């Protein structure tokens, strides 16, 4: 058997590859020589048919490697480079133009955005300052309103005291004038007046005239202004009225104003109480505590305004109403029936029928009692008109006092 020969050029290829000085084309040629030697050895040993299918593929691969290593011709490279340079030049010009547009556009937008931001910040600061001013003015307004309410209350109290003092002063002047007059010069009218005052129960030693008590109770007097004016027009007959017409009209005007204020305060109190009762978040214990506090405060205010000692609490006061609202239980729907009671319908149905019989049975007797008590009840007050509503309120409040 013939010894295997080394492929020519293989040691040189290794040395060139190690040295790194061979070109790509030379490497392809050395590779082709080595592969050809190996294929010839295979054909000599095993026959030409052993490498017949492999040779065309190896040759095609080596040709492609040669074309890739050598590259195209210089003329073809120049022809393909010219349009590429033109396209590159055009793209550079377009790039410069786009850069200029991009550089000019954002500057204007940034300037506009900067101005808008400054305006927005300034408006936000102004709005915050306005909100602070409005909040401060609102607090000042509330404080002024509270002061005004206190001043109005003090003014009304001072007016009431002034009217009482004027009444007492006039009464003292009249008593002093009567005391200075000689006893034999007393007129028959003065004697009759002294006799009537001495016989009237509840008068203080018969010295204070009747017009003094009437003037002190002017805010709660239920008389009509026309009747008061008629009484004013006859000062010589009674010898008791010492007020002028202007003073009496001023007193009536103050009384009407006070009644109007009391009516408005009652309406406002009823509204707040209605809101409080309809609020389901308020517990019942708090409502009871508020009930006791309102009742005590009402007694204190009443005793202070009337100048009487504070009354002790009684069982009737505790059971009495503490609000100005009417009973509106009929407005609320009945609670829904429990589903558990439906399983025991026989027992609950019997209880419901018995309760209905109990509620329906005393109705005739109750109606009869009302009919019997109706003739004994006093005659109802006449209806109040829009002009005399405050007078009617005073008339209804006088019997209670």
From Swiss-Prot:
Residues 167-239, 304-388 are annotated as: Disordered. Changing residue 306 to A: Abolishes interaction with RAB7A and localization to late endosomal/lysosomal compartments. One of its GO terms (cellular component) is late endosome. GO terms for biological process: cilium assembly; early endosome to late endosome transport; endosome to lysosome transport; endosome transport via multivesicular body sorting pathway; intralumenal vesicle formation; negative regulation of protein catabolic process; positive regulation of protein catabolic process; protein transport. InterPro entries: DZIP_RILPL, RH1, RH2, RILP_dimer. Ubiquitous. Strongly expressed in fetal heart, heart, stomach, spleen, adrenal gland, thyroid gland, salivary gland, fetal liver, liver and lung. Poorly expressed in brain. The modification Phosphoserine is found at residues 314-315. It is found in: Late endosome membrane; Lysosome membrane; Cytoplasmic vesicle, Phagosome membrane. The modification Phosphothreonine is found at residue 308. Residues 240-316 form the RH2 domain. Residues 11-101 form the RH1 domain. Keywords: Coiled coil, Cytoplasmic vesicle, Endosome, Lysosome, Membrane, Phosphoprotein, Protein transport, Transport. Changing residue 252 to A: Abolishes interaction with RAB7A and localization to late endosomal/lysosomal compartments. Residues 272-333 are annotated as: Necessary for interaction with RAB7A and RAB34, lysosomal distribution and morphology. Changing residue 258 to A: Reduces dimerization, interaction with RAB7A and localization to late endosomal/lysosomal compartments. One of its GO terms (molecular function) is protein dimerization activity. Residues 310-319 have a biased composition (Acidic residues). Residues 172-181 have a biased composition (Basic and acidic residues). It comes from the Eukaryota. Residues 75-181 form a coiled coil. Homodimer. Interacts with RAB7A. Interacts with RAB34. Identified in a complex with MREG and DCTN1; interacts directly with MREG. Interacts with CLN3. Interacts with FLCN; the interaction is direct and promotes association between RILP and RAB34. Rab effector playing a role in late endocytic transport to degradative compartments. Involved in the regulation of lysosomal morphology and distribution. Induces recruitment of dynein-dynactin motor complexes to Rab7A-containing late endosome and lysosome compartments. Promotes centripetal migration of phagosomes and the fusion of phagosomes with the late endosomes and lysosomes. This is Rab-interacting lysosomal protein. It comes from Homo sapiens. The lineage of its organism: Eukaryota, Metazoa, Chordata, Craniata, Vertebrata.
